[in-house]
């Protein structure tokens, strides 16, 4: 009995201790989790640099690391400031860090910096060097004056009858990036663009928008790796003037022009009554290349509205298109803004129904030009709607007297049918380019202008002061460039 009673007391005491350890004074349970294990230390096990096979001004640094999430390269040349690449993922334990924008013939050293939950760690130093430019690109010179906005200027150059180059040069005129594409037939320069997905697209082909010859756009990564080709679906030919990619994945869409050729009566514009000419179609393609939207100029436009004169010999049918679109962009509401050079017209088209929303300029102009001493534009290029809703375009000025090229910004009031000139820039001395050209409003508020037919680029402030200029020459002569377009970064899309 005594032993039994003693056991009961001991058990009660034990129960009291156990229960008391799991209760607080206010009756709420307190659970004390075990301390987390310390994060595992980030370790870089190897780094190695290699040349880029498509671009002597680029390199690649391979890194293998443990317990790291991401890595970047800090690098520089002797006596120069340290630069940094964007970070890349190390989720798989290894990655290749692209290094872009190197200077020809310069040696660099750098360290890989890896990041993880335990902090960051740096590798031993690794060396690499930029090579020489290809011989064809060594014929290119860019002379600059002034100080331009940060970033690079893109230009597409067909050189030596053998290679089409996508080139980026900095504000000092040094070529800092390129990608070459070999060809065996004559090439026309076309649209070169950095898309919002960070990749670049370049037109490869001989057409200028009317010839019965094949062509396509090639999409390639900043490293130069070719990703895919994009073309108008059969039976259309692919036009060289514009490609814009929007969205991603299943929502990705490609916006471009195609064209076909038909026998037409050109007598209303002084040509033969039966000649084969080209007419264009606005296309929106799905990721698989099928058409989601088509809008044919043959159905909506008239040959008799062709106001830019055809070539001296209208029977040279391989060179004729009556509409000649050269810009395709999206308005703030998602509808299309199209520039038709040969019609002297900018058109807004409903991107779903295909209905014409308005027509500015040309024979079917629906607007009154206000405060514009030249009462409109002609042979225009690069029409874009700005974030404030204004229309910015490059006015080639073929129909001005005297002929002069300028950049114009209009405030549009579709309800009142007015286009009010709110800003323009005319170069001093005057520059006239009958063909090609580009204009961009930069993040700084400055405007970048590409006088492509003259191989000249200008950046101007809002008050019209020239901040920077560049002259691009090949073998000492001005080079024809379809567009001279600014980008903010070689690695990823960034507003310039």
Regions found by a protein language model. Give the residues of each.
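Hydrophobic helical h-region of N-terminal Sec-dependent signal peptides
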Residues: 12-16
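Short proline/glycine-enriched turn/loop motifs at strand-loop junctions of beta-rich domains
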Residues: 65-70
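Structural beta-strand segments of beta-rich domains
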Residues: 55-61
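Bacterial N-terminal signal peptides that target proteins for export
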Residues: 1-11
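Recognizes extended acidic, P/S/T-rich segments that occur
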Residues: 72-105, 117
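Histidine-/acidic-rich catalytic cores in large beta-rich domains
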Residues: 40-43, 50-55, 107, 113-496
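Generic structural detector for well-ordered beta-strands
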Residues: 62-64, 89, 98-101, 127-129
């Amino acid at each position: 009995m005594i032993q039994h009673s003693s056991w009961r007391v001991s058990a009660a005491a034990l129960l009291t201790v156990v229960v008391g350890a799991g209760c607080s004074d206010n009756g709420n349970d307190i659970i004390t989790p075990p301390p987390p294990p310390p994060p595992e230390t980030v370790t870089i096990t190897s780094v190695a640099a290699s040349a880029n096979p498509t671009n002597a001004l680029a390199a690649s640094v391979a890194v293998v690391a443990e317990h790291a999430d991401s890595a970047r390269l800090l690098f520089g040349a002797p006596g120069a400031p340290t630069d940094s690449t964007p970070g890349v993922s190390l989720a798989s334990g290894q990655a290749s860090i692209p290094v872009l924008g190197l200077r020809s013939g310069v040696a660099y050293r750098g360290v890989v910096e890896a990041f993880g939950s335990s902090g960051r760690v740096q590798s031993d130093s690794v060396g690499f060097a930029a090579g020489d430019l290809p011989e064809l690109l060594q014929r290119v010179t860019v002379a600059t004056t002034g100080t331009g906005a940060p970033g690079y200027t893109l230009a597409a150059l067909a050189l030596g009858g053998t290679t089409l180059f996508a080139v980026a040069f900095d504000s000092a005129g040094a070529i800092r990036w390129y990608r070459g594409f070999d060809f065996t037939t004559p090439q026309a320069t076309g649209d070169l663009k950095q898309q919002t997905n960070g990749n670049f697209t370049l037109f490869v082909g001989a057409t200028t928008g009317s010839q019965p010859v094949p062509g396509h756009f090639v999409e390639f990564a900043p490293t130069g790796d070719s990703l895919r080709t994009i073309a108008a679906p059969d039976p259309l030919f692919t036009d060289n003037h514009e490609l814009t990619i929007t969205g991603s994945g299943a929502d990705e869409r490609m916006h471009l022009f195609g064209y076909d050729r038909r026998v037409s009566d050109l007598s209303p514009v002084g040509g033969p009554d039966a000649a084969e000419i080209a007419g264009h179609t606005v296309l929106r393609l799905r990721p698989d290349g099928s058409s989601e939207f088509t809008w044919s100029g043959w159905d909506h436009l008239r040959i008799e509205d062709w106001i830019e004169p055809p070539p001296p010999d209208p029977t040279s049918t391989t060179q004729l298109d009556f509409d000649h679109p050269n810009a395709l962009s999206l308005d703030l509401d998602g509808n299309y803004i199209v520039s038709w050079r040969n019609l002297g017209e900018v058109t807004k088209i409903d991107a779903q129904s295909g209905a014409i929303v308005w027509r500015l300029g040309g024979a079917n102009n629906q607007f009154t030009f206000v405060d514009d001493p030249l009462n409109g534009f002609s042979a225009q290029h690069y029409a874009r709607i700005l974030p404030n809703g204004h229309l910015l375009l490059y006015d080639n000025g073929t129909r001005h007297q005297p002929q002069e090229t300028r950049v114009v910004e209009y405030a549009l009031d579709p309800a009142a049918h007015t286009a009010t000139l709110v800003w323009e820039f005319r170069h001093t001395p005057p520059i006239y380019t009958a063909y090609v050209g580009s204009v961009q409003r930069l993040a700084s508020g400055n405007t970048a202008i590409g006088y492509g037919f003259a191989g000249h680029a200008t950046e101007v402030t809002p008050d019209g002061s020239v901040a920077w200029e560049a002259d691009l020459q090949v073998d000492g002569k001005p080079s024809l460039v379809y567009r001279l377009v600014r980008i903010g970064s070689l690695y990823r899309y960034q507003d310039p």
